[in-house]
Structure formats: structure tokens, C-alpha cells
Amino acid sequence: MAFRDKSQCPMYMGETGENTDEWIESFRKALDEVNIGWTFWTYKRLDAQRSFVSVPMPEGWQKICDFLAADRSEYALIREVRPDQSEMRRILDVYLENCKFANCRPNDGYVAALGLNP
């Protein structure tokens, strides 16, 4: 902060790690006290508490994650681990439906920790 004051440059905290609502509130207040701007990420996350709202995880989502984590360095390997496409489309369609705000779960504790009205 001495550098900030000496050089007349604003400080900004662009992103922090995931923590508890209590930690987030404490850190946010500390930043506010010393006039450091901040951003907490993200607005929506899949089945998580550390975001403004949580997107419900669709049944079968792990199949997509497993495919993405599999060795796909050769076409033969891709074909070997490739999941059923109609099932993947169904899972992704459910995911897109779940992303609609009306289907998300608000994380009131997270919002309150940021000093906002949930």
C-alpha cells in the first residue's frame, strides 16, 4: 500500500481463492477498509456454495467429466471412450435448462458475505 500511495496508483484484487463465507466477509471488509477494489468470482458455478448462485448438477454429468479426463490423444482412443451421443446431448440439455436463473439455487451466505442484500 505504500507503493500505491507513493505512486498514486489504485490497487485492485481481481480474484481470490475459494473459502468460507466467514473468510470472504472478513477479507472483503479488510479490502474495503484500505480502499482496495475487488471482484469475487463467479456469478454461477455448478453445484457449489462459492458463487452468487449454484447451477444444479445434471444426473450423468460425471460421464462428461470422465470423457474429458480420458486419454484422447489418438482417434482410436477417442472412439473407445466416447460416450453415447444421445445421452450426452440429454445431459447437456438438462445442464442448459439448469443454468436458467429460475432453476439456480441462490447462495445467500455468499452474497451476504460480500456485503450485498441477498
Segments (PLM) and residue ranges:
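Substrate-binding cleft of secreted/luminal carbohydrate-active enzymes
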Residues: 3-117
